[in-house]
Amino acid sequence: MAELGLNEHHQNEVINYMRFARSKRGLRLKTVDSCFQDLKDSRLVEETFTIDEVSEVLNGLQAVVHSEVESELINTAYTNVLLLRQLFSQAEKWYLKLQTDISELENRELLEQVAEFEKAEFVSSSKKPIIDITKPKLVPINEGGTTELLNKEILRLQQENEKLKSRLKTIEIQAVNALDEKSKLERVLQDLQLDQENQQDLLKAQDLDDLENTVATLRSEFQKTLNDKTENQKSLEENLAAAKHDLLRVQEQLSMAEKELEKKFQQTAAYRNMKEILTKKNDQIKDLRKRLAKYESED
């Protein structure tokens, strides 16, 4: 393990990147230096300058330096993105997911460690052999142990993934079939409910017709009975009135007969005749009373 906590291979990769960054940084610094040198050669030819002239010179220099520094910072950011892309692409080939901690990029202690590492590596760079900057690709290592276990685990996960996909497809088919069956059953249920409602409506209509017919029959019978009773009552009333008239007539005749009897009481033959008449009248009265009592009881 080296100063950065990396193995030798990865440390060499870091050194190559730092060499690349130092080279780009040196070029940009030379560009900035040339900006100042050009300014000296082209503008600082007079012995004295006015305030406006000094301001103009400094503003021009500021614009040039600002452009160069901004370009370098942008280029550095893009370069770092490309470097991360290479690392992530190689990790994805091994089904790995790398994570970064952005907050560590501003860790002052770690930055100082990197500075010390750069100083140790490049201050005496003339005494060290130049390392080949060609970056080797991260290729699978044909060794046992961890690599073999990782390959087996990847293969097992792939097989399990295929099984899960197959099972998911089967479940989806079953779910679709179940939904179709549910839809069919719902349609059948709706049809049955509709038929039941129609039958209930038909039965209700039939029951209503039967009830109306029954009510009509009962009403007709009641009206007939009422009419018969009315006619019978009318007949009884007529018979009663006739009987009363007959009774009054007989009573009148009886009264007349009694008066006549008093006149002819001394006449024996007449008396006998009158007695016979009186007896007959009494019999008629009894008969009429019986008839009258019978009619009154029926009423």
From Swiss-Prot:
Tissue expression notes: Highly expressed in testis. Expressed in brain, cerebellum, eye, heart, kidney, liver, lung and trachea. In small intestine, graded expression along the crypt-villus axis with high levels in the villus apex and lower levels in the crypt stem cells (at protein level). Not expressed in skeletal muscle and white adipose tissue.
TM region(s), chain numbering: none
Stretches the record annotates as Interaction with BSS9: 145-299
Keyword Coiled coil attributed: yes
GO cellular component, one term: cytosol
One GO MF term: identical protein binding
UniProt keyword terms in alphabetical order: Coiled coil, Cytoplasm
Main localisation: cytoplasm
Coiled coil: 96-299
Record's protein name: Leucine zipper transcription factor-like protein 1
Source organism (scientific name): Mus musculus (Mouse)
